[in-house]
Structure formats: structure tokens, C-alpha cells
Amino acid sequence: MDAKKENDILEKTLAIAESGYPEAYQFLMDAYEACPASYGPQTLYFLSCLAGGTDKKTDVLMWLKKAISDCGWWYRPEVLEDDDLGLLKDEQEFLSLKAVSDARYAEAAASSKACFSWMKKTAENLFLAVHGNTQNAETARADWETVLAGKDCWQIETIQSGEPDGYGTYRWSYDETSYLPVADAMEAVQDKGLSLIHI
């Protein structure tokens, strides 16, 4: 899966969806069908919602089955309560898929922990890349490595939230505890002889 390419396609899909779901659905479906291996859970979720927004109940179930049953992926429970999926809220097949996804989420949430990539100082300055919601440390690193390419005075490290958002992705809840992994990471590098730390 090419996370950068997938994110770019999803951003373009959102822009198209502002003018109409049918066009956005066709655009994303064409991109996916051209190279399915380049896309992950977020794309199948988008396809499900776009299909729902165009009243294609059979397609919604097809995409969710592919994600949850075929690929073994899962989503945060609230995500499958999206208005675009509302046409399935009483469908037994949808409820069964949601139950499987919810159970996988609960299992992941019970064992997930924040991760800080720091091992040792390798450059004068530290750039701490923090991912956004529905992303992960790998995404954050890839986004910032291109910006800092060729700047050897910077060491890029990542902090990943301990709160899962979906299969392979994480989120920050912006509550009284979600900032703690970042604060702990900052504290861990305070005495490492760095000239500058940037988040």
C-alpha cells in the first residue's frame, strides 16, 4: 500500500464530493480498481460512504465486506455510524459486520500503547513528527522526510498515539490525557544535548 498516494487520492475525492457524491464515487472506484493493492481501509471506508450517499446499498455492503471480512480490517465504532451508512442501520448483514469490526477495535484498544521512535541522538536538532487522526507514525515520517530531505542537521522522530482510530491508524482525542505521550517524549529528550526541538 502506498499511503502517500492513497492520502492524495482521498483528498482529491473529498474535493470532488463537494460537487457531488456520484462523481466522487466513480473517481475513487476507478482509482481503486486500477491498483487495489495501493489502497487500504480508509479507501474502502470512503467507497462505502460514497456508495451510501448515492443510495447504492449493495455496493456499501460489498465494500464493507471486502474491508472487514476479506481483509480483516476494522474501524472505530462511531465511524460505522456515519449518516452515509444510515440506509443499512437495520440490515442484519451490516449489523453483523459492525459487530465484528467493533470487537476487533475493542481488542486493539485494550492493547494499544503510544510509541516514541527515539533511540539515540543522530543529529543536532530534533523534529518530532506527530501524525494526524486516521494516520500513524509512518505517515507522519513520510510527510516530513520530504520536507527535511538533505538537511542533515535534523533528526526526524515520531510519536504515535496509543488510541486506535482504525486498522493501522491512530487518533488524538484532544482530552486531558491525549497530550501525555507528546509531553513524555519531550521530557525524554530534554537532556540529550539537542540544540533545537521542533514539533
Show where each model-derived region lies:
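A domain-start/cap signature at the N-terminus of enzymes
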Residues: S69, W73-L126
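Serine-hydrolase catalytic machinery in alpha/beta-hydrolase-like enzymes
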Residues: K121, N125-G193
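Conserved small/polar residues in nucleotide/adenosyl-binding loops
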Residues: I197-I199
